[in-house]
UniProtKB/Swiss-Prot annotation:
Keyword Hydrolase among record annotations: yes
UniProt record, GO biological process: rRNA processing
Protein name, as recorded: Endoribonuclease YbeY
Keywords, alphabetical: Cytoplasm, Endonuclease, Hydrolase, Metal-binding, Nuclease, Ribosome biogenesis, rRNA processing, Zinc
Native species: Nocardia farcinica (strain IFM 10152)
Required cofactor(s): Zn(2+)
InterPro entries: MetalPrtase_cat_dom_sf_prd, YbeY, YbeY_CS
Superkingdom of origin: Bacteria
GO cellular component, one term: cytoplasm
Stored SUPFAM superfamilies: Metalloproteases ('zincins'), catalytic domain
């Protein structure tokens, strides 16, 4: 899976987290592993221009999605596997997101992760124009975001356990994996 990110916003953000959450959601939604995604982080003026140009709405917004290929999440188990495709572009505005994060009482990093999930879901055809669609999309968005956070916690826990095990084995005279087997 190829995920390109370009930060043109002038704001330092954890790009690796945005790639991580996008990759997680794409995987959870059964999108072909060779799919491609582009993410661009822009300033307020650029986002306002895009918002007016594509949505005919004044002022900036937090996230916009521009799908490329028609994709459906999941699919039938007996259907032929689709080939790689270009999901599309997600445009994020960190400055706008920072204001939203402050109002919501959480971090910019959390807001950008949430907006990335939101953007990927739009690329996959989810929308929130109607109340029922909004309910479905926002529930899925919340579930995927929580699952991503849980996967990070689990990875951190596994790394801590591996480090602890290596320390204990080292104290007992055993070498690290990849070294000669048996006691040192």
């Amino acid at each position: 899976m190829s995920i390109e990110i370009a930060n043109e916003s002038g704001i330092d953000v954890p790009e690796e987290d945005l790639v991580s959450v996008a990759r997680f959601v794409i995987g959870r939604m059964d999108v072909h592993p060779a799919a491609e995604l582009s993410m661009v982080l822009v300033d307020l003026d650029t986002m306002a221009d895009l918002h007016m140009r594509w949505m005919d709405l004044p002022g900036p917004t937090d996230v916009m999605s521009f799908p490329m290929d028609e994709l459906e999440p999941g699919g039938r188990p007996d259907s032929p596997e689709p080939g790689p495709s270009m999901l599309g572009d997600i445009v994020l505005c960190p400055e706008f997101a920072a204001d939203q994060a402050h109002k919501a009482g959480h971090s910019l990093e959390h807001e950008l992760a949430l907006l990335t999930v939101h953007g990927v879901l739009h690329l996959l055809g989810y929308d929130h124009a109607e109340p029922e669609e909004e309910k479905e999309m926002f529930a899925l968005q919340a579930r995927l975001l929580e699952e991503w956070y849980e996967s990070l916690r689990e990875a951190r826990r596994r790394a801590e356990l591996a480090e602890r095990d290596a320390r204990l084995l080292g104290k007992a005279g055993f070498t690290a994996p990849g070294d000669a087997l048996g006691p040192a």
